Amino acid sequence: MYIVMNSNFCAIYKSMSKEGMFLYIAQRDKFNAVPEQLLQMFGKPQFVMLFNLAGEKPLKQVNNQDVLLAIKTQGFFLQISPPAENLLKQFLIQKGEKK
């Protein structure tokens, strides 16, 4: 499937049910290219912002061009952030090693 983007802007949504999960689509509130099963898993999307993928500002965790290509070819890009570090667990491991 090929998605026609009107510009290099995309709409970014965060999942309210899955921490660190973001969905990038070509146009705000146009989820028709996103599989229904993915939308159900994602939960109610909360709009974050419009973002210029061709601009000078890079995304923090993913490459702008990778997102743009995914949107153009499959209609969306799903970002799943790595889990947060468990600092307590790391501390306890280090504390145990020092004994």
Curated annotation (Swiss-Prot):
Pfam families assigned to the protein according to its UniProt record, in alphabetical order: YcgL
Source domain of life: Bacteria
SUPFAM superfamilies assigned to the protein according to its UniProt record, in alphabetical order: YcgL-like
Domain YcgL: 8-92
Matching Gene3D superfamilies: YcgL domain
Protein name as it appears in the record: YcgL domain-containing protein HD_1373
Species whose genome carries this gene: Haemophilus ducreyi (strain 35000HP / ATCC 700724)
Taxon lineage: Bacteria, Pseudomonadati, Pseudomonadota, Gammaproteobacteria, Pasteurellales
